């Protein structure tokens, strides 16, 4: 009888083969091992055991070896990895009778802690793998009332008594199951997308360290990383490496608020102690296409939204410098004191870049603080091909830059950069003696917490620093160039098709591609209020169908008097041309009968 072990002769002919083994060719071994690996560990081992009992000794060796190879290659934390410390090998653990009190720091809690965390890591790794699998849905949509009522054992209500670790693991799985896969290559809904593996590792480490950024004393390495990274970012903006300051904040809205606080303190330092009653009637300026956080800061800081003056924009969403200067003169004539303007480098909807050079000229003429909100567009500074779109940014007094947007750093990661050293410290310092003692044994200038408006501050720097180390500046440049190339591909693909209409003429400056889908019923229909009313309903209907099917996600919104349109943004380096093609085909499929 011929051996069942694969050989050149065995693969070319089945003559003389054992009839009990001819149905288990090498491809079948792989298939069954793949099935086993896809099951829970216990069931997977049962499958292998069954296959072992029904094959010869040689088959047993083949099957077990194949399964072990699959396990070790796909799950480095599995118990088959004999090189690992025995304490960190997976064992069969009954979590139904274990509770949080059984984990560390409980006495003899190490084994349960290790096994529990290995299960959590397995859940996370499975989620990561599926996130990059295009056959996986972007979301499994449910209405709020469905999730609140409970889904298949997933209950959001809090209980008085502890639940088992088995239930906690189920809750971990279901939380991911019913969420949105923002790292999926076909998720285009927000400016912040993607799932960077190095950044993910950095965030895991950050949470494990669980420290605060307010002093060098408790976060020495993280504080130094932040200083070095902020210095590098200021150099990329174009400022002197010796001067300047900055801090990471909880998002671009807070970074923008910091800029207004710094400007106000620069011109009117007495506001810190005496309040707004001690200063003249101040006004600040921003474009009608700028982020709403500028108006929100105006309300929060006591200026009032009426004193946040909106500057007109052209058809591409860029500030009109002449209107800016006219509004300065108008405010001065009314007795107001202009002191600040926000220019946007990459608007949220159109992706427009305001003319920073011309705005800077006006600021110098009238002695205004120039802030550049580059939360969305700042990443283009990393690209030699595209950084010209931010020409003049080096003339700004402050800059907001969100690496968690175009650079793909995991949320949250936003920096406020200030050209003049000492402004943030002077503006926000309160000298709390229980935190910021002046007589410590190290250089207390590294205690950065007093220049923040927060006390507790999350460590946002490590994942960013780690990604920069892993990619290098060139890696970020390539990533950003690729996303912009995909936007150009999308624009070229739809600009001349009858079923699509561009919101504005010309190629987009950023990865924002704004367009209407025109259903068959509206094609060729002249513009009128009735047509616009019908068109206004198209994007929301397609978006709703999109979410129900879970295949992809893209945002929509109105702008001024324009009907709802799709705003496609690309910041996920995992996206490809095939994903752009899929999105367009999906919009056509979902909208064809509207």
Swiss-Prot record:
**Cofactor(s) recorded in Swiss-Prot or TrEMBL:** pyridoxal 5'-phosphate
Q: Where does 4-aminobutanoate bind?
A: 190-192, 567
Q: Which CDD domains match?
A: DOPA_deC_like
Q: Which residues carry this modification: N6-(pyridoxal phosphate)lysine?
A: 405
Q: What is its EC number?
A: 4.1.1.15
The biased composition feature labelled Low complexity covers 1-13
**InterPro entries registered for this protein in UniProt:** PyrdxlP-dep_de-COase, PyrdxlP-dep_Trfase, PyrdxlP-dep_Trfase_major, Pyridoxal-P_BS
The UniProt entry, under Gene3D superfamilies, shows:
3.90.1150.170, Type I PLP-dependent aspartate aminotransferase-like (Major domain)
**One Pfam family of this protein, by short name?**
Pyridoxal_deC
Q: Give GO cellular component annotations, separated by semicolons.
A: axon terminus; cell cortex; GABA-ergic synapse; inhibitory synapse; perinuclear region of cytoplasm; presynaptic active zone
**GO-annotated biological processes:** gamma-aminobutyric acid biosynthetic process; glutamate catabolic process; locomotory exploration behavior; social behavior
| Superkingdom, taxonomy of origin | Eukaryota
The UniProt GO MF terms for this protein read: glutamate decarboxylase activity; identical protein binding; pyridoxal phosphate binding
Annotated region (Disordered), positions in chain: 1-23
Q: Which residues carry this modification: Phosphoserine?
A: 78
Q: Which keywords appear in this protein's UniProt record, sorted alphabetically? A: Decarboxylase, Lyase, Neurotransmitter biosynthesis, Phosphoprotein, Pyridoxal phosphate
From the UniProt record, list the reaction(s) this protein catalyses: L-glutamate + H(+) = 4-aminobutanoate + CO2
This protein's assembly is summarised as: Homodimer.
Q: What is this protein's function?
A: Catalyzes the synthesis of the inhibitory neurotransmitter gamma-aminobutyric acid (GABA) with pyridoxal 5'-phosphate as cofactor.
> Into which family does the record put it?
Belongs to the group II decarboxylase family.
Its name, as the record gives it, is: Glutamate decarboxylase 1
UniProt organism field: Pongo abelii
Query: What lineage, starting at the top, does this entry show?
Result: Eukaryota, Metazoa, Chordata, Craniata, Vertebrata
Originating gene: GAD1
């Amino acid at each position: 009888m011929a051996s069942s072990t694969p050989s050149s002769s065995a693969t070319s002919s089945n003559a003389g083969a054992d009839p009990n083994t001819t149905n288990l060719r090498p491809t079948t071994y792989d298939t069954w091992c793949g099935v086993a690996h896809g099951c829970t560990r216990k069931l997977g081992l049962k499958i292998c055991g069954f296959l072992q009992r029904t094959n010869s000794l040689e088959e047993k060796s083949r099957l077990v070896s194949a399964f072990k190879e699959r396990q070790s290659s796909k799950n480095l934390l599995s118990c088959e990895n004999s090189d690992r410390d025995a304490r960190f090998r997976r064992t069969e653990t009954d979590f139904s009778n274990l509770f949080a009190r059984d984990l560390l720091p409980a006495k003899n809690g190490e084994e349960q802690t290790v096994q529990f965390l290995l299960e959590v890591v397995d859940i996370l790794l499975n989620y990561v793998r599926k996130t990059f699998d295009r056959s996986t849905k972007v979301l499994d949509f449910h209405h709020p009332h469905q999730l609140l009522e409970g889904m298949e054992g997933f209950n959001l209500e809090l209980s008085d008594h502890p639940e088992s670790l088995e239930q906690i693991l189920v809750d971990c799985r279901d939380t991911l199951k019913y969420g949105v896969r923002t790292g999926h290559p076909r998720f285009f809904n927000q400016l912040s997308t993607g799932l960077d593996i190095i950044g993910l590792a950095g965030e895991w480490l950050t949470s494990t360290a669980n420290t605060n950024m307010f002093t060098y004393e408790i976060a020495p390495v993280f504080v130094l990383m932040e200083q070095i990274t902020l210095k590098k970012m200021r150099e990329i903006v174009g400022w002197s490496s010796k001067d300047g300051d900055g801090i990471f904040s909880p998002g671009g809205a807070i970074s923008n608020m910091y800029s207004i606080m710094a400007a106000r303190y620069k011109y009117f330092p007495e506001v810190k102690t005496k309040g707004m009653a001690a200063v003249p009637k101040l006004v600040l300026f921003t474009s009608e296409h700028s982020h709403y956080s500028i108006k929100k800061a105006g309300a929060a800081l006591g200026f009032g939204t009426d004193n946040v003056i909106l500057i007109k924009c052209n058809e591409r969403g860029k500030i009109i410098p002449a209107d800016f200067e006219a509004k300065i003169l108008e405010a001065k004539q009314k007795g107001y004191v202009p002191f600040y303007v926000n220019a946007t480098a990459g608007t949220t909807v159109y992706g427009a870049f305001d003319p920073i050079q011309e705005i800077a000229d006006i600021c110098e003429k009238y002695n205004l603080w120039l802030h550049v909100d580059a939360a969305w567009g700042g990443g283009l500074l990393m690209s030699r091909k595209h950084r010209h779109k931010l020409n003049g940014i080096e003339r700004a007094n402050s800059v907001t830059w969100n690496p968690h947007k175009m650079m793909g750093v995991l949320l949250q990661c936003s920096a406020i950069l200030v050209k003049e050293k000492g402004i943030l410290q002077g503006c926000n310092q309160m000298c709390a003696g229980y935190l910021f003692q002046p007589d410590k044994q190290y250089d207390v200038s590294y205690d950065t917490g007093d220049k923040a408006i927060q006390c507790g501050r999350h460590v946002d720097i490590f994942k960013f620093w780690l990604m920069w180390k892993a990619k290098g500046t060139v890696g970020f440049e390539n990533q950003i160039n690729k996303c912009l190339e995909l936007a150009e591909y999308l624009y070229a693909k739809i600009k001349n098709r009858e079923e699509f209409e561009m919101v504005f003429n010309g190629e987009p400056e950023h990865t924002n591609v704004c367009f209407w889908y025109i259903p068959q019923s509206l094609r060729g229909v002249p513009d009128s209020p009735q047509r616009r009313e019908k068109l206004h309903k198209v994007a929301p209907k397609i978006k709703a169908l999109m979410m129900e099917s879970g295949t992809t996600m893209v945002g929509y919104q109105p702008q001024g008097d324009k009907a709802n349109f799709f705003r496609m943004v690309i910041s996920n380096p995992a996206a490809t041309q095939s994903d752009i093609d899929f999105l367009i085909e999906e919009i056509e499929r979902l909208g064809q009968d509207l």
